[in-house]
Amino acid sequence: MSAATKKRYITNKVGSEFYELAEEDIIAQVRQSRGNNLHEVLDQNGDSYVVSMPTKFRKAVWLRRDQFVVVRPIAEGDKVKGEIEYILDQDNVLYIRELGKWPSCFEEHALKMTREAKRGKANDKMIDDDMLPPSESEEEDDESEDEIEDTYDEDEETDDEEFDTYNPNRMQAPSK
């Protein structure tokens, strides 16, 4: 496989597949980049440490601060304690959350990614019902509907009458 093909394959894989968590996988949030493909992460247990990015992701996928990754711990490291297994996009975060495997310490970040939060529809009420202006009663709505129907009936009567307009496409002019 050429380098361009590998890059295209990894980019498509990250963007189109849902990741299934293994038992030893840890979800972590990227805090900062240390350089040389090393990143400082905060994991679901509250520990902060450095992880490495494998060769397959280098120059193909870019990490940003506060983005979520799946980390697989490695035993042979003093400073580097894990390797990035998968980079989670928004769809994967919501998928893992639906499965019930999303850590509770990152729940606030996952809630911001939901459709309801993006549309501005929150589950909890931010404005009390007492603070809202009073709504119109149903009686007023019934009266306004009757008025609209009366107006509509008057319009129908005028439609039945013939118009005295001249149509140049007719042979004769209308008689008055």
UniProtKB/Swiss-Prot annotation:
The source's domain of life comes to Eukaryota
Tell me the Pfam families matching this sequence: eIF-1a
> Keyword annotations for this protein?
RNA-binding
InterPro entries for this protein: EIF1AD, NA-bd_OB-fold, RNA-binding_domain_S1_IF1, TIF_eIF-1A
* Region described as Disordered: spans on this chain: 117-176
Task: List all Acidic residues biased stretches.
Answer: 129-164
Give the family per the record: Belongs to the EIF1AD family.
Record-given protein name: Probable RNA-binding protein EIF1AD
